[in-house]
Swiss-Prot record:
The gene is rpoB. HAMAP family: RNApol_bact_RpoB (MF_01321). Keywords: DNA-directed RNA polymerase, Nucleotidyltransferase, Transcription, Transferase. This is DNA-directed RNA polymerase subunit beta. Its EC number is 2.7.7.6. GO terms for cellular component: DNA-directed RNA polymerase complex.
Length: 1386
């Protein structure tokens, strides 16, 4: 059982009601395993990797003239040259190089026939394909220095799907359709039309009768009829028509009166023919029954009727019978004929109607093409629909159809599609056949006819059995395949054009890998599924990597996606989170995997269940897909259980195919693993989620992803137990690779010394400090282990941003009161105490990057220098001798960060100037100041500077100094590792020798030892290693052997460390890669502190968001009886209508945690003699409220030091975990209230801070976990005086990024009109907008202190006239109105 008090490196009281038997699987497993299966970079045998399969699907490539072939012989992957960090700093892609080995075969061939006769020559060559972006250990990609994530795509699974949808032509009419969806290739649609004709469409082209497709596949008319209809033999006796009596033809009610050969009525029309009665009739000898004439009239012939005498075909197959034709048949004296029985159960006239519909078009084609064979004509008809206007022969048409569905290069339904088709249509085609077969097409249509006639099952396209996940590996394989197909075409073209001798030809002459390069680069750089990684905090990063998008190539388009696709489906249970999805137009199209969900190798999502047998829960855990779950009866996780594993009661509420039913407990087959399996990671971090409305929970889970990392982190008092899981799987924390003891530790390094079966080893972990993330938040790691502490493998040893003791910590625990406060918390606004600012509670650090390039220009090279023309000395005193700002400088807007001068264009100097230059030398006047200045909205401390210099150019002193410092750091690191490994070696050797007796006499310094004596550790430690080498010879051979083994192991370890060090130095020595034309690149990183301000957005975890409206002095805030001042005042009206009651319960539990923490603090402060015993008792008493935990046992086993450490943490507030759907119950609340000595209503008397008067009503006060979101007012507020204007309209541009103006819209105009502010309005619409001349005149008038002149004509008017003129309408603007007389009007 995994439920324990331990959470990260602290204790947390867990209120789970169900024992947790399975740990949450690694949250990033899907991405990791998918990419690993694609590349298999670390495997020795890579034959099964996705990349190998792609290459094999395209090769071999043959020359159309049978002269040469290209074969694929394997691929090779070369590891990355740079580390992840360096790629980010240098702005390059973190990638592996891919090489493929290609074999070129030259063939001997017969000159006459052109056939191959034997191999002439074979050449093999390794060809570099391209660099493929390589997944970092944090499951992201570095593309051009930017960290990106490839989101998993949720798309329609290949296979066959049957639907019922509304006809586009006539409203209300439902039509039935079948679709065969491939992964690659032409889509095939079969659809009924309102006239009951079955049509087929290929790739949404014009529809054609389905029988044309069957004929093109080679079926004759009779074959098709036999495939779709029972053929009934009509026997003629005494001018009456009879059929053989078969009871199975009369399922359900009988359509017509059934009479025997003598005309006796057996079954009346509309009655049922039971099995019993049918059997009785057979026993009575009824063999034939009369076929009514009126029913026979509308039937069609299944075989032609031939005149026996002349041999002439009177009536062809499918001729519709009528009175005249039947008379003729009787006259001819024919005994029997066959009809198509289209009135049999489950049949309709669709195929017959299709035959009738296709007759006209085939007749026309017969005349135009001059071909008699209808099958060839059908193929030509399809070709003409697919490629209209192109010339066609019957061979081309047949080959085209063959390519369309039966060619593996053009068509692929994948293993998944084949499996689904076999399952749906009852086929047993082998899984490796991933093209269509004729049988697939026939069976699809047969099933569609059944569906139309109420016998088949309509599919639900939103069922997760019909949707699958394409993860990074598959998406990349598809891109690679499309690139290779383009390359294959180019190679074939090249092969066919090669002439002359082929002896000198090499594989690289044929292969152009640029096509592959372009497709892969496009996918990563601009693809819809390759996204800029959300790095605001660890949670946002993890959920971004677990995201499932229905958009992207081959997916849905958000503008066209309907409501059904977006809705929550019963099969989402345990697979896709029903809560976490964006608000807005992407709602429901972008989802997240549930906590325990896994994705199987076919891409279907699996949910975890425990098996139930005979009403007893077993320990067996199974993962099922939505399709496997069909028909299963599943009990919920919170079903009551007795005796540890038996379901209580005789009946239980359970789910079956999305319906809730009441069943006997013995019929239950499965039970949910845990209630948490329903929701995703972000939603499972919301305590008391079960008490929140889904809309607000959605906002809550989305807003947690926007929480900014704070300066000081603090884990929530009220958590859910998922905090440790997120911290465990986020790359921001460092986990120990192997177990061992912390040997050395500082703020930047952790060294762990351990031992395994191979001997001792040392693991070094480098901590990251002050790094900028994608969202400009600050990323810093800090150690949470101590020197000498033993660390398990996989244990978290450092906290990242938003982490506290290996738990996720997104915000702060704040004392909150729900009450109005002078109208300042109207409409969700938040009133905040000044204490929060003073104590830096919600202060965050943001790092911004500014960069500048020095380029090679036509007339010289730009230079980064301190020597800038026309700049005062005091403006550059913070720059070093290279002209770059010093680290630690506090910069303000307008300050120079990097000095840069650019040469002016060549100006011919005057003779005087030339003379002066000759005397005084070149002067600095021919350069322009192009320095990098600190932008307007930025202020902060320079935390880092990176300088990159192109090969062949001198490095400046600053770059040389940075290089020397890094080299020194690497050397110190290497030296420390060697020292530790040396010390461990000596300890091992001394330990070995001190236990063994001497075999010969030995002497250490002046002391002699006789054979058989043992030398103590103290004496051995006095000797140096050279003396030890001599001393070992006095020991037995076995001891010497062990000694040599130890020496060898440690020498190998040291060699490994040295190789590692040399590798790092080699990378450091590498030249910088810069874009062409760039000589030097300088990046400056500025850290800005952002305190909480009025206008910042804050939120709780329950979707309760608001804007800080006022920051109140601490003394004015409400306070409790015991003098506790409230931190935040929230509006109580934000709770009832939003229905997120979880926040109230959180506040109560938070206050309980704090009060219990104070009780522990009192024990510390009292310092009684047996205070440890008292602490232990208190902690057991608190933890015992949660039933499931073995708290007493755990706490009693703890050492005093451990206990005091955990109690110190609890003294700031006892930490609780209330998991979703199994949180704290009312009874547990009562016990906790009692322990915390609180009132049962959870309310408190509050006093007004300004007057000291008590508020009339008692107020809900408690601790809520509040987050500061990344919508910061500092980054949003912006003002413009004058600035850029739009080119066409001449109106100011919009937005902060462009330094734009505020839009004065329609409603603002109404506001000015309402106030009668005519002049202000005129000003707004002219000189402040697009009156070009007017604004220039106004500017002049203001500078000269003159009155502002009348506005001119707005540019909009000129734009309008130009647009009208472009339509051919002559428009003139008249400067003044002429007199009426002159214009000729009265």
């Amino acid at each position: 059982m995994l439920n324990s008090l331990q959470s990260g490196s602290r204790l947390r009281v867990d209120f789970s009601k169900i024992p947790q038997e399975l740990d949450v699987p690694n949250l990033l497993q899907l991405q990791k395993s998918s990419y690993e299966n694609f590349l298999m970079a670390d495997s020795k045998s890579r034959e099964n990797s996705g990349i190998e399969k792609v290459f094999r699907s395209v090769f071999p490539i043959h020359d159309p003239h049978n002269r040469i072939s290209l074969e694929y012989a394997g691929s090779e992957i070369i590891k990355p040259k740079y580390t992840v960090r360096e790629c980010m700093e240098r702005g390059i892609t973190y990638s592996v190089s891919l090489k493929m080995n290609i074999r070129l075969i030259l063939w001997e061939r017969d000159e006459k026939s052109g056939e191959k006769t034997g191999v002439k020559d074979v050449k093999e060559q390794s060809i570099y394909v391209r660099d493929i972006p390589y997944m970092t250990d944090r499951t992201s990609f570095i593309i051009n220095g930017v960290e990106r994530v490839v989101v998993n795509q949720l798309h329609r699974s290949p296979g066959v799907i049957f639907k019922e949808e509304e006809a586009s032509t006539s409203s209300g009419t439902m039509i039935h359709t079948a679709q065969i969806i491939p992964d690659r290739g032409a889509w095939l649609y079969f659809e009924y039309d309102p006239k009951d004709i079955l049509y087929v469409r290929i790739n949404k082209r014009r529809k054609i009768p389905s029988t044309i497709l069957f004929r093109a596949l080679g079926y004759s008319k009779l074959d098709i009829l036999k495939l779709f209809y029972p053929i009934t033999k009509i026997i003629i006796k005494e001018n009456k028509f009879f059929i053989e009596f078969r009871p199975e033809d009369f399922i359900g009610r009988v359509e017509f009166d059934v009479r025997d050969e003598n005309g006796n009525l057996i079954v009346e029309a509309g009655k049922r023919l039971t099995k019993k009665k049918a059997q009785k009739l057979i026993e009575e000898g009824v063999k034939y029954i009369e076929f009514p004439l009126d029913v026979l009239m509308d039937r069609h012939l299944a075989s032609p009727i031939i005149d026996q005498e002349s041999g002439e075909v009177l009536y062809d197959t499918l001729t519709q019978l009528d009175e005249h034709k039947l008379k003729k048949i009787l006259e001819l004296g024919i005994d029997e004929f066959e009809i198509v029985n289209d009135i049999a159960s489950g049949k309709d006239r669709a195929i017959i109607n299709s035959f009738i519909a296709d007759q006209e078009s085939l007749k026309l084609l017969k005349q135009t093409e001059g071909i008699e064979d209808e099958n060839d004509l059908a193929a030509i008809r399809i070709y003409k629909v697919m490629r209209p206007g192109e010339p066609v022969t019957k061979e081309t048409a047949k080959a085209f159809i063959q390519q369309l569905f039966f060619d593996p290069e053009r068509y692929d339904i994948t293993r998944v599609g084949r499996m689904k088709m076999n399952h749906k249509l009852g086929l047993d085609v082998p899984e490796y056949v991933t093209v269509l077969t004729s049988e697939d097409i026939i069976k699809t249509v047969q099933y569609l006819i059944k569906v139309k006639n109420g016998q088949g099952h309509i599919d639900d396209r939103d069922h997760l059995g019909n949707r699958r996940i394409r993860a990074i590996g598959e998406l990349l394989a598809n891109e690679l395949h499309s690139g290779l197909v383009k390359m294959q075409k180019a190679i074939r073209d090249k092969m066919s054009t090669i002439s002359g001798s082929l002896d000198e030809l090499m594989p690289h002459d044929l292969i152009n890998s640029k096509m592959i390069t372009n497709t892969i680069l496009e996918f990563f750089a601009t693809g819809q599924l390759s996204q800029f990684m959300d790095q605001t905090n660890p949670l946002s990063e993890i959920t971004h990597k677990r995201r499932l998008s229905a958009l992207g190539e081959g997916g849905l388009v958000k503008e066209r996606a309907g409501f059904e696709v977006r809705d929550v489906h019963p099969t989402h249970y345990g697979r896709i989170c029903p809560i976490e999805t964006p608000e807005g137009q992407n709602i429901g199209l972008i989802n997240t995997l549930s906590t325990y969900a896994k994705v199987n190798e076919l891409g279907f999502i699996e949910a975890a269940y425990k098996v139930v047998k005979d009403g007893k829960i077993t320990d067996e855990i199974v993962y099922l897909t939505a399709a496997q779950e069909e028909g299963k009866i599943i009990a919920p996780a919170n079903t009551e259980i007795i005796d540890g594993n038996e379901i209580k009661g005789d009946y239980v509420e359970a789910r079956k195919d999305g319906e809730i039913i009441l069943v006997e407990k013995n019929k239950v087959e499965l039970i949910d693993l845990t209630p948490r399996m329903v929701v995703g990671v972000a939603a499972s971090l919301i305590p008391f989620l079960e008490h929140d409305d889904a809309n607000r929970a959605l906002m809550g889970s989305n807003m947690q992803r926007q929480a900014v990392p704070l300066l000081r982190t603090e884990a929530p008092i009220v958590g859910t137990g998922m905090e440790k899981v997120v911290a465990r799987d986020a790359w921001e924390s460092i986990r120990a690779r192997r177990s061992g003891v912390v040997e050395k530790i500082d703020s930047e390094n952790i060294y762990i010394l351990g031992e395994d079966e191979n001997g001792a080893y040392i693991d070094h972990y480098r901590l990251q400090k002050n790094l900028r993330t994608n969202q400009n938040t600050c990323f810093t790691q800090k150690p949470i282990v101590k020197k000498g502490q033993f660390v398990e493998a996989g244990q978290v040893i450092t906290d990242g941003p938003n982490m506290d003791h290996a738990e996720l910590a997104l915000g702060k625990n704040m004392l909150v009161a729900f009450m109005p406060w002078n109208g300042y918390n109207f409409e969700d606004a938040i009133v905040v105490s000044e204490r929060i600012l003073r104590d830096d509670e919600f202060t965050s650090v943001h790092i911004y990057e500014k960069e500048i390039e020095a380029r090679e220009l036509k007339h010289g090279v730009e230079e980064i220098t301190r020597d800038i023309p026309n700049v005062k000395e005091e403006e550059i005193e913070h720059l070093d001798e290279s002209g770059i700002v010093k680290i630690g400088t506090y910069v303000k807007p307008g300050m120079i960060l990097v000095g840069k001068v650019s040469p002016k264009g060549e100006v011919r100097p005057s003779p005087e100037e030339r003379l002066l230059r000759a005397i005084f030398g070149e002067k600095a006047g021919h350069v322009v100041n192009k320095s990098l200045y600190c932008p307007q909205s930025m202020e902060g401390v320079v935390v880092d500077v990176k300088i990159f210099t192109k090969k062949g150019y001198d490095k400046d002193p600053r770059a040389i100094k940075a290089y020397e410092e890094e080299k020194e750091r690497l050397s110190k690191e290497h030296h420390d590792k060697l020292l530790m490994i040396d010390r461990e070696e000596m300890l091992k050797i001394i330990s070995l020798l001190s236990k063994e007796p001497l075999e010969k006499d030995a002497k250490i310094k002046d002391k002699e030892f006789k054979a058989g004596e043992k030398i103590s550790k103290e004496e051995l430690s006095q000797i140096n290693r050279f003396a030890l080498n001599a001393l070992v010879k006095s020991y037995a051979p076995e001891v010497q052997k062990k000694y040599n083994a130890i020496k060898t192991h440690f020498q190998n370890e040291k060699r490994k460390l040295t190789e590692e060090h040399e590798e790092k130095l080699a990378i450091l020595e590498k030249e910088d890669i810069l874009p062409s034309g760039v000589v030097k690149l300088v990046k400056v990183f500025i850290a800005t502190k952002r305190k909480l301000k009025v206008g910042d957005k804050m939120a709780g975890r329950h979707g309760n968001k608001g804007i800080v409206s006022v920051i109140v002095p601490e003394i004015d805030m409400p306070y409790t009886k015991d003098g506790r001042i409230v931190d935040i005042v929230l509006n109580p009206l934000g709770v009832p209508s939003r229905m997120n009651i979880g926040q109230i319960l959180e506040v109560h539990l938070g206050l309980i945690g704090k009060k219990l923490g104070e009780q522990i603090q009192e024990i510390f402060e009292a310092k009684r003699a047996d205070f440890v015993k008292e602490l232990r008792q208190k902690m057991i008493e608190i933890a015992d409220v949660a039933k499931l935990m073995n708290a007493k046992e755990t706490i009693e086993k703890m050492s005093d030091e451990e206990l005091i450490e955990y109690a110190r943490d609890w003294s700031k507030g006892v930490k609780f975990a209330t998991p979703v759907f199994e949180g704290v119950t009312a009874e547990e609340f009562e016990k906790l209230y009692e322990l915390a000595k609180m009132d049962l209503d959870g309310k408190t008397e509050l006093y007004d801070g300004r007057t000291g008067e008590k508020f009339k009503e008692r107020v809900t006060v408690g601790y809520m976990y509040m987050l500061k979101l990344h919508h910061l007012v500092d980054e949003k507020v912006h003002a413009r005086s004058t600035g850029p204007y739009s080119l066409v309209t001449q109106q100011p541009v919009g937005g902060k990024a462009l330094f734009g103006g505020q839009r004065f819209g329609e409603m603002e105009v109404w506001a000015l009109e309402a106030h009668g502010a005519a002049h202000t309005l005129k000003e707004m619409l002219t000189i402040k907008s697009d009156d070009v001349e007017g604004r220039v005149a106004a500017y002049k008038a203001i500078t000269k202190g003159e009155p502002i002149p009348q506005p001119g004509i707005p540019e909009t008017l000129f734009v309008l006239t130009k647009e009208l003129q472009s339509l051919g309408i002559d428009v003139e603007i008249l400067d003044e109105v002429k007199d009426d007389e002159e214009t000729g009007t009265n």
